[in-house]
Amino acid sequence: MIRRFPTGIALVLVIFAAAGGVGAEELPDTRPLSSWQAFDPEAYQDGWLTLDRNDDGTVDYAVMVNDAGNKVREAADFNRDGYMDDFYFYENGVLQREEIDSNYDQRIDIWIYLRRGVYIEMWERDTDYDGVIDVREQYGSEAE
């Protein structure tokens, strides 16, 4: 039996366990937020399904689905500090990318790019939290 872990937790563990990477001089300066992303939970209104998982009066999970019922976008506040810190991007219902604010400063510092929703193709990280990507690890595509 295969047990699946929540994607965010498993991917963060993989990133922190990984060594090496590409030097900052070879990386783009920053990655801007997508137009739909917001750290403020109040921004998730029209078109979003929201949930207050700990009943504190603040939304800490938001998901947008398409007409077929597939996820399109997702945002979560895992530490429940009132700000979204984990963002998921789907294409045709398959997870393509995850962006994480790992130190909860309302700035993305980990980017994870996936293939087929489960295989990590590449990850990037801002290790000193200055808004500039410092490390990148890219993995080759395996024959399927």
Task: For the regions a language model picked out, list residue spans one by one.
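Bacterial N-terminal signal peptides that target proteins for export
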Residues: 1-9
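N-terminal targeting/docking segments
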Residues: 3-4, 18-22
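Bacterial N-terminal signal peptides
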Residues: 8-18
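Calcium-binding acidic motifs and repeat modules
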Residues: 20-144
